[in-house]
């Protein structure tokens, strides 16, 4: 049975100031997008020209200015500089104000954001970061019941805690995964799953999607009920040279996960990224000036079973991208099946 295809837009918080980013999200809804997602960084990946608006303030502002788009984080780390109980409160409040439109996308975190906000000591290994994430999700979901919560976990604790304003529709939690371990957990416990494009066909076909299915089956859940989101890095423009050059600002995406997770300053991230040649930077992106070529490359991801495509455009003229997307790409994409 074919599943509904959703088209979303990634609001580039590392690239635009808060007000401009709100206006871009409003434009995304006007141009037909089904969702808008925002990253949650305390520090951007670039020191020069970078931005880092607070995701929760942005989400509330976008909620007031829009009517139908889903609004969420892609992604937030609710485990170090944030107390997950407070994050639960924030998302419950937004869920009350914008019913059925708020989602919480979560990940295990990067050192860049946490050290700057006061984290001390050696950056935790993946095992601890993943354990913190699972525990944080359990705590938040308990709080969203509205019942008294006395939570005594390994990392987080509450005492006689109540969530007094709880939305009628539960807040869906989307789990970001770059490998099969977390992807299995997303299938087991997530309302949604998030991954990013441009990392090699076998990752999606042989590791991530099969792991989500495996997790869902073991938990006796319906795989089709899990919203499977992918951030698609796309630099589409009728001008081929502009399509290529637009990727330069986002060179940090082409660093290895090991480099990104351990770097603890924006200046160092920028230095490493700017050493990369434009050809290597562009490899993470679908760079296209022909709409049929662009859609054919996107089709790979729907063929893998991903049903919620969130498009991240690298250029500084986001309205130009949205106009071209609505005119050239959306009609073709809407014909794809999952």
UniProtKB/Swiss-Prot annotation:
Keywords: Carbohydrate metabolism, Oxidoreductase. The keyword DNA repair does not apply. It comes from the Bacteria. It catalyses: oxidized coenzyme F420-(gamma-L-Glu)(n) + D-glucose 6-phosphate + H(+) = 6-phospho-D-glucono-1,5-lactone + reduced coenzyme F420-(gamma-L-Glu)(n). The active site is at residues 41, 110. Substrate binds at residues 196, 199, 260, 284. One of its GO terms (molecular function) is glucose-6-phosphate dehydrogenase (coenzyme F420) activity. Coenzyme F420-(gamma-Glu)n binds at residues 40, 77, 108-109, 113, 178-179, 181-182. Homodimer. Belongs to the F420-dependent glucose-6-phosphate dehydrogenase family. This is F420-dependent glucose-6-phosphate dehydrogenase. It comes from Gordonia bronchialis (strain ATCC 25592 / DSM 43247 / BCRC 13721 / JCM 3198 / KCTC 3076 / NBRC 16047 / NCTC 10667). The lineage of its organism: Bacteria, Bacillati, Actinomycetota, Actinomycetes, Mycobacteriales.
